[in-house]
A protein has these predicted regions:
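Asp-box/BNR beta-propeller blade signature and adjacent active/binding-site loops
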Residues: 290, 298-745
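Extracellular glycan-associated modules
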Residues: 1-298, 302-304
């Protein structure tokens, strides 16, 4: 069932061809609300306003639509949001309702193609088309040449001789493991100079360079089981990309196509140019003069579409950006999605950031409106913030627990001061302009360092009232940046506060924040904060949340956990795997860590069947692999740090969740951004069936912009993935088990 099920709305479909940036379509109303979809910097761009919100959305992953070839475009719009499809597959979505009903009076849609842009086959549909219906309406790309024999004709070979970029498609199979050979080859003057093969290493594409050296591009894997496979080699934009069965398997810098073949006079399939044949067969193949996009390649392989809905994005509830997803399915079946709401600028702290949630009562098909759960005063870079939520549920009583970082105004991880900022009871320690310290008591009163009463009282939101001689006057706000309020009297410590909030009614109402620094932070730490995403509840009942913190050298961090054996009433910090670690021949510890190569940052946790706890960690080790360690005592101590050879690391947040079934109780799925392109991108999901000891399959979910993510298993057993495109927003996708199971090779 589509995520749009149950919503009425509208759809539009068309085809366009563009050679230059310019307008495509727009919707106008008499009160100046409306929107326009156009091409900017060779990518789609949507901007405008509805009765509910304004938006400006850069669909940067649609780059190169100005290639002069025909593309299909579809838009669906409902009160739950809108989706944009390019060449049959969803390329973007937004919380904005793009339908005429959501804009002003007499809103009408117009085609507005600019110079150098053609539009045809425009249709308006009085219903929300499903992803499958849109795919069926989208034609496959037209090849320059299709193979009808083992050799191309001389005329067709000549057509290829000047192509510096383009796409190769072939459907092949071999006769079983260990049987390999050439899928396609090309040469000139009796010398083979281009070859596409299935080998022991995987799919290999190589081109003979000008200096007589082979330039080799390999997608590592085993596609020799005897099944039919589609292989696509896409060459352009400075890279060679290799797809198998519609999914990106390798993105490799460098560009080499048929124009690199000196005196090209022969192109063959199912054999090399000497006649040595593939141990199998090529059923069909085609060559394209254009660099096909991800959607077009998926269309060639009949990939089933994944339905995605935007839950938080730029403009939603008047905020400039949302980032940092958290996601959980509760015992009741309610699904809770959390996000940082960045009101005026998109940056991390220091910034005005709120914690917000949306909830689903039908397994992620529909979502309620935004709830602002936790907010602090101030605006912009001077505003106080909460950031990086991490969520867990206590299954014993249903309590939903979230740990989150709080910074006062003007403070973030880079400039936070060392210290706790609270007393042994978790009460804020305040200071005035002269450095005198005070305690903010639970009843709102303030006492000085000796416990004496003062003229100050403080409201729950931090507003200070000064009462002298029976007269009240404002005293600023303790959470604001220093110097912002002319009435400033008292401020909290300029440090990081790890805080907890909870809900006992599935996220409908929430507690206020509780400070945890007194239990888990040390005076020498300026930062001690969550690893955003998901925590775990062990079978023993212990709640465990991944964290990381810095020491004497503020730029270097160590991963750890905090844990609670009483449902969140009290917390303890476990040791870091960096404490006592032998690194490059010397013993290190988390307080004095002075090398980034040994640092461990945001982490994710999995409890295994044997009770051990696996932690997978973001890092900048030269290996370029995700760091890992195992605890046998519930996170109190950790074993040696090692690196997961199967998991690429580009210094980005990881997330993992168990996905067990009766026949595979230790199935785990892991996700991260796995490649710099040069931006952070290529979101990949990986599958383990032994609790994360080995990783047997992987599949690229989004080949371009992709940063943080959080996952949960939904009530119907499918995977819910809440993921981000850096600054654009957070998107929810439902992924069936067979999607990742099909990647097993």
């Amino acid at each position: 069932m589509s995520i749009d099920a149950g919503h009425t709305g509208i759809s539009w479909t068309l085809q366009f061809r563009a050679r230059i940036d310019g307008a495509l379509i727009e919707l106008h109303s008499t009160d100046d609300t409306g929107w326009r979809l156009f091409i900017r910097s060779s990518a789609l761009f949507l901007e405008g306003s509805t009765n509910a919100m304004s938006f400006a959305l850069d669909m940067e992953d649609t780059a190169s639509v100005t290639d002069g070839t025909w593309h299909s475009l579809a838009i669906t719009a409902t009160s739950a949001g809108s989706k944009i499809f390019l060449d049959g597959y969803q390329c973007f979505s937004t919380t904005a309702d793009l339908s005429p009903a959501a804009s002003g009076p007499e809103a009408t849609l117009k085609l507005t193609p600019g110079a150098g842009i053609d539009i045809r086959s425009f249709t308006e549909h009085d219903a929300v088309l499903s992803p499958a219906e849109i795919l069926a309406l989208s034609p496959a790309p037209t090849p320059l040449i299709e193979f009808a024999a083992a050799h191309l004709s001389d005329y067709d070979v000549a057509e290829l001789s000047e192509l510096t970029a383009g796409t190769i498609f072939a459907r092949y199979r071999v006769r079983g493991p260990g049987q390999h050979g050439t899928i396609l080859a090309a040469g000139g003057g009796g010398i083979e100079q281009l070859n596409l093969s299935v080998t022991e290493e995987g799919i290999e594409y190589k081109v003979l360079g000008r200096r007589g050296e082979w330039r080799t591009f390999t997608a590592h894997g085993h596609w020799d089981q005897g099944h039919w496979h589609d292989v696509v080699v896409r060459v352009g934009h400075g890279a060679v990309q290799i797809y198998v069965d519609g999914y990106l398997e390798a993105h490799l810098p460098g560009q080499a196509f048929f124009a690199a073949v000196d005196s090209l006079d022969e192109v063959v399939i199912g054999q090399d140019t000497s006649g040595s044949r593939l141990f199998g067969e090529v059923r069909n193949a085609a060559l394209f003069s254009s660099v096909l996009n991800d959607s077009q390649i998926k269309k060639l392989s009949s990939v089933a579409p994944v339905d995605t809905q935007c839950l938080f994005d730029a403009g939603f509830h008047d905020s400039i950006s949302y980032r940092i997803p958290s996601l959980i399915t509760l015992e009741s079946g309610v699904v809770v999605a959390g996000a940082d709401q960045r009101e005026t600028i998109a940056n991390d702290s220091p910034n005005s950031i709120n914690f917000t949630v949306r909830r689903s009562f039908d397994g992620g098909h529909t979502w309620g409106d935004l709830q602002t759960v936790l907010t602090y005063p101030g605006h912009g870079a001077k505003g106080a913030s909460v950031i990086d939520s991490c969520v867990v549920q206590d299954r014993r009583n249903g309590r939903l627990v979230i740990l989150i970082d709080h910074f006062p105004g003007g403070i973030g991880q880079p400039n936070a001061e060392a210290g706790l900022g609270v007393d042994a009871k978790g009460r804020y320690i305040l200071h005035d302009a002269n450095g005198a310290t005070y305690t903010w008591n639970e009843d709102g009163s303030v006492t000085d360092a000796d416990g004496n009463a003062t003229p100050f009282t403080i409201s729950e939101r931090g507003d200070v009232t000064v009462t002298e001689d029976g007269q009240e006057s404002p005293g600023g706000n303790v959470f604001l940046a220093d110097g912002v309020d002319p009435h400033q009297t008292l401020l909290t410590a300029r440090t990081c506060f790890l805080q907890m909030i909870y809900s006992d009614d599935d996220g409908e109402t929430w507690s206020g924040p509780f400070n945890l620094n007194q239990d888990v932070k040390e005076e020498w730490m300026s930062f001690c904060g969550t690893s955003p995403g998901t925590g775990v509840q062990l079978r023993s009942g212990r709640l465990v949340i991944p964290i990381y913190y810095n020491g004497d050298h503020k730029r270097h961090f160590s991963a750890s956990v905090v844990y609670s054996d009483d449902g969140g009433a009290t917390w303890k910090r476990g040791k870091s795997p960096n404490d006592g670690r032998i690194f490059e021949g010397r013993e290190i510890d988390s307080r004095t860590l002075d090398t980034e190569a040994a640092a461990t940052h945001e982490a994710t946790l999995i409890e295994r069947a044997d009770g051990s706890l696996l932690m997978l960690m973001r890092n900048q080790h030269p290996s370029g692999k995700v760091a890992a360690t195992v605890s046998t005592d519930g996170g109190e101590t950790w074993g040696d740090v090692f690196f997961a050879e199967e998991i690429t690391e580009i210094f980005c947040q990881p997330n993992a969740v168990p996905w067990p079934t009766d026949d595979c109780p230790e199935r785990v799925v892991f996700a991260n951004a796995s490649q710099m392109r040069p931006y952070r991108g290529r979101g990949v999901l990986r599958l383990s069936e032994d609790g994360g000891r080995t990783w047997i399959a992987s599949r690229t979910f989004n080949p371009a912009h992709y940063v943080y993510q959080c996952m949960t298993i939904l009530p119907d057993g499918t995977l819910g993935l809440l993921w981000e495109r850096e600054m654009q927003g957070l998107y929810f996708s439902r992924i069936p088990l067979e999607w990742i199971e099909a990647a097993k090779i």
